[in-house]
């Protein structure tokens, strides 16, 4: 097994942690944007359907 120094190990753990945080943050932002878009779209569809029902 290769001898890995303590410093390299700490650095790799830090990089892995930072990339995980960054990835999770971006994924959560995307998820929120998708949910907001879906909510807005469904509300628009509901309004259109209610308008049709009112006209009928």
Swiss-Prot record:
Q: Which InterPro entries match?
A: Mtln (IPR038778)
**Which terms in the GO cellular component ontology are assigned?**
mitochondrial inner membrane; mitochondrion
What Pfam families has UniProt attached to this entry? MTLN (PF22002)
The cellular location(s) given in this protein's UniProt record come to: Mitochondrion inner membrane
For this entry, list what GO says about its biological process.
cellular respiration; fatty acid beta-oxidation; lipid metabolic process; positive regulation of fatty acid beta-oxidation; positive regulation of mitochondrial membrane potential; positive regulation of protein-containing complex assembly; positive regulation of sequestering of calcium ion; striated muscle cell differentiation
Give the source's domain of life in one word.
Eukaryota
Q: Can the keyword Membrane be found in this entry's annotation?
A: yes
Asked if the Swiss-Prot or TrEMBL record annotates the protein with the keyword Endoplasmic reticulum, the reply is no
Protein keywords: Membrane, Mitochondrion, Mitochondrion inner membrane, Transmembrane, Transmembrane helix
- Main location as per UniProt: mitochondrion
List the membrane topology term(s): Single-pass membrane protein
> Subunit structure of this entry?
Interacts with mitochondrial trifunctional enzyme, a heterotetrameric complex composed of 2 HADHA subunits and 2 HADHB subunits. Interacts with cytochrome b5 reductase CYB5R3; the interaction is required to maintain cellular lipid composition and leads to stimulation of mitochondrial respiratory complex I activity. Interacts with ATP synthase subunit ATP5F1B/ATP5B.
Q: What does this protein do?
A: Positively regulates mitochondrial complex assembly and/or stability. Increases mitochondrial membrane potential while decreasing mitochondrial reactive oxygen species. Increases mitochondrial respiration rate. Increased mitochondrial respiratory activity promotes myogenic differentiation which facilitates muscle growth and regeneration. Increases mitochondrial calcium retention capacity. Plays a role in maintenance of cellular lipid composition through its interaction with cytochrome b5 reductase CYB5R3 which is required for mitochondrial respiratory complex I activity.
State the protein's name.
Mitoregulin
